[in-house]
Amino acid sequence: QQLVNKSEIHDLEPHIKPIYHAGVYYPYARHARNPKKILLKLFDLFLKKGGKFNKENIKDINFNEEKPIFKTENQSFIFDKAVIACGAFSKKLTDNFGENIPLDTERGYHVHFKNCDHLLSRPVIFSNRGFGITPMEQGLRVVGTVEFGGLNNPLSKSRVKNLINNAKYMLGDLPEHEDEWLGF
């Protein structure tokens, strides 16, 4: 990491308004401009290496002689071992295991501005305002603020507005945002 001054910030990211006098630059940091493409490549590799994929709506999980049984609407699948990796949705499947797994939903806010990825060349975190902006293939992704809010509560429009206002404060005029969502 390197400490940078006001002019170095401008040299690195000229579209950020010149309101910061110092920052920290991580020259070896990396990010994915399209995480979905990476996941699809990994999935293709999984299939090429002999992995199998069934898209099913799992309704319940039980055990028979220590083996997990995944039940769908129409059939059951028995495995020697299984990993439940459904993120925030895992609790719905694990509730009937007889153990209280303390899992809640951490929801992160995202706002997407289309066709603005040229404004930044790397992710930038504005720690004093609690948000970050990352250039993606599809535009700029503005992220910040998290909450424990469950799976079913609607997103907070005031948090979305805060992200939009912060992004405009740092970068100036931006077009109307294209999308907003919660990441679980």
Mark where each language-model region is.
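Helical element adjacent to the flavin cofactor pocket in flavoenzyme catalytic cores
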Residues: 18-81
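Flexible hinge/switch segments at interdomain interfaces of large molecular machines
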Residues: 11-18
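Dinucleotide-binding Rossmann-like beta1-alpha1 core, especially the glycine-rich loop
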Residues: 1-7
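Active-site substrate-recognition segment that forms the wall
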Residues: 63, 76-77, 81-184
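Generic secondary-structure signature for well-ordered alpha-helical cores
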Residues: 14, 47-51, 169-173
